[in-house]
A protein has these predicted regions:
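Radical SAM [4Fe-4S] cluster-binding motif and immediate context
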Residues: 1-178
Length: 179
């Protein structure tokens, strides 16, 4: 409460902590861990509703990575026949979809923004759910446009060149502005 509420442009809500990546420039995986932990969906939605009552219409989902389970994560767990891990990942993914379904039911004047990895562009189901949930923008990490640069920052999972451009276009095609 340092400033009167009407001086704030937007509010923020954190829905998940931790990130399974280990990018060299990022402290999150060291400070918050590599195992994503989600807040309860109902608690998150209630916080958003409370913020709306206070007059906020733009909310940043201040997660370090709004897409903590990739399709590749699911595929690897399945191939390894790691049933426990596969169950955990599917549950985490289901919670993400549940959250987005509930956000989609909020009044249409609510708009959200988040941070996400490029891998989400490979998941049209997830991008569609984001669009329906009024997530209008995403900060997508593009730390380098070369393979060598990505390797240097431990982001070999990201893309470069035409592949990078194609993935960024996927976000746009689903109504999500990339920053």
């Amino acid at each position: 409460d340092l400033l009167p509420r009407d001086r704030y442009m937007w509010a923020s809500v954190q829905t998940v902590r931790g990130c399974p990546k280990h990018c060299s420039f990022c402290s999150v995986w060291r400070t918050d861990g590599q195992e994503p932990r989600q807040r309860g969906v109902d608690a998150v939605v209630q916080e958003v509703v409370d913020l709306r009552r206070l007059g906020f219409r733009f909310v940043a989902l201040a997660d370090d990575n709004f897409y903590p389970v990739t399709l590749e994560d699911l595929e690897l767990a399945s191939r390894r026949a790691d049933h426990g891990r596969l169950h955990e990942l599917k549950a985490l993914r289901a919670e993400r979809f549940e959250l987005m379904e509930k956000l989609a039911k909020l009044p249409s004047d609510m708009n959200f923004f988040t941070q996400i990895t490029m891998e989400a562009a490979e998941d049209p189901e997830f991008l569609n759910a984001m669009r329906k949930a009024h997530i209008k923008g995403a900060l997508v990490g593009v730390e380098s446009v070369t393979a060598a640069g990505l390797k240097d920052v431990y982001k070999g999972f990201n893309l470069y060149g035409d592949d990078l451009v194609d993935r960024l276009r996927q976000f746009k095609a689903h109504g999500i502005h990339v920053l």
